[in-house]
């Protein structure tokens, strides 16, 4: 069977960082995917969906210090990751867009709780207690279109999704209707019922 993988990059990166399973780069992601292959399986392609770092400037609301988000350590790590994926065999990189939602910031949940409980006040907050409200756009759409194209053109026999997003359910239903075997790798994350309902098997290789 020809096997195609589709990876929600933001989701997988977050899970691997939490589990500390392996150094997160193109070659190691490829090795992880290959663990899913069984006798008679061949790798068709690994589609990786993500966004480039936010390319904007702003001011931290706590200190008012200027920030160039494209030059932060997090951004530099993301650029390195994307370059690594581009250089790794069998990968197809699909990039959506990164948006800063209304230039808003999100307060750390623990700090928010401490504020409500009056254990701290606003003057106790530091720059690292807030992060910009970042949204990924067009990632789910690109994944859905690729699933539909591969399924209808019979380019692969088995699809393995590494994601936790139930928004791709319509595309998974189409793939199964077209005769593909559909698997889900949640990377040990809880699975939404509507997602597990529309796959043939669930397996994690961590």
Model feature map: region roles:
Residues 95-206:
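Nuclease catalytic cores that cleave nucleic-acid phosphodiester bonds
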Residues 1-115, 127-128, 132, 181:
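Domain-level signal for Mg2+-assisted phosphodiester chemistry and nucleotide/NA-binding surfaces
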């Amino acid at each position: 069977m020809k096997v195609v993988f589709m990876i929600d990059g933001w989701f997988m990166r977050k899970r691997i960082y939490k589990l500390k399973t392996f150094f997160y780069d193109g070659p190691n992601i490829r090795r992880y995917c290959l663990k899913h292959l069984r006798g008679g399986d061949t790798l068709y392609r690994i589609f990786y969906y993500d966004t480039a770092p936010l390319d904007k400037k702003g001011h931290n609301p706590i200190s008012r210090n200027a920030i160039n988000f494209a030059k932060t350590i997090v951004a530099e790590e993301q650029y390195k990751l994307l370059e690594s994926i581009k250089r790794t065999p069998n990968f197809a990189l699909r990039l959506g867009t990164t948006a800063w939602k209304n230039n808003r910031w999100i307060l750390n949940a623990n700090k928010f709780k401490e504020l409500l409980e009056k254990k701290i006040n606003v003057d106790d907050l530091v720059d690292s207690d807030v992060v910009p409200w970042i949204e990924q756009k067009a990632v789910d759409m690109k994944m859905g279109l690729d699933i539909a194209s591969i399924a209808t053109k019979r380019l692969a026999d088995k699809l393995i999704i590494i994601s936790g997003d139930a928004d791709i359910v319509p595309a998974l239903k189409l793939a199964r209707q077209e005769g593909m075997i559909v698997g889900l790798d949640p990377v040990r994350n809880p699975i939404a019922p509507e997602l597990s309902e529309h796959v043939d098997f669930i397996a994690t290789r961590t």
